Amino acid sequence: MSRKAVSAGVSIETVTRVNFVCSMDDVAELLRQHDACTDRKPGRPLPRLEVLKRAAVILAVTAWESFVEDTVRNYASSAIEKASRPSDVHSLFNSVAQRWLEGKPKPPELADWTGNGWKGFLKNKLEKDLLALNSPNSENVRTLSKRYLGEDLTTRWHWERTTPMLATRRLDALIRLRGEVVHHGREAFNRTAAIQRKQVVEAISLLNHLVECTERVLGLAPIDIDT
């Protein structure tokens, strides 16, 4: 956990959240640079300024991806370490064991699961799954959270005027936008539509809400302590 000063005391936050906030500060700075160059005047900005909005979208999604990876890794690793028997993490254990058995292991290999050896298998599977995460969209977050956190986080993403279904749709739309920016970027003859400032602002708001919902569900929300 990390501590941050607040007006009436100290706020205790996870390091994962602090890292996310720092990354999103960079996103906000890119938007400020864009606004400073355009003076927020109506009309389409100069093409050379579009890079600021494209970079902001890429950084925002990268911050979200890192948050997902670190949250799943830290929460699952802690649960595995604290477990005294496989039944303490039965859902995760059964999932990994089933995959292992599908490989038709030889009898001598069963010895690797004895003692605390099973914990190593779970941790290795965790790292492989996180390494394979190439898109932090709702489907992948759903799969990871059900396997390693014990529930589908996407069903808990809701806030004022936003349902879980709407939240997942917006996230997936943002991920697709990031993909378009990464794979196409600035193309000749403007074959791809420019990113609107509004899209960057909405992305920042969406990801902040998703982080808040995720940490609240896992009992990791910031704690304010009066001093």
Where on the chain are the PLM-derived regions?
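Charged alpha-helical initiation segments
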Residues: 1-58, 72-75, 81-82, 86-91
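Polyanionic, low-complexity intrinsically disordered segments
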Residues: 3-36, 151-227
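Intrinsic-disorder-associated interaction segments
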Residues: 9, 13, 20-23, 65, ...
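Solvent-exposed, non-transmembrane amphipathic alpha-helical segments
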Residues: 40, 44-47, 83-99, 191-194, ...
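Generic hydrophobic-segment detector
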Residues: 46, 50-53, 107, 140, ...
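Short runs of predominantly hydrophobic/aromatic residues within well-ordered alpha helices
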Residues: 53-60, 64, 68, 72, ...
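Helix-loop junctions and short alpha-helical segments
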Residues: 59-60, 67, 71-162
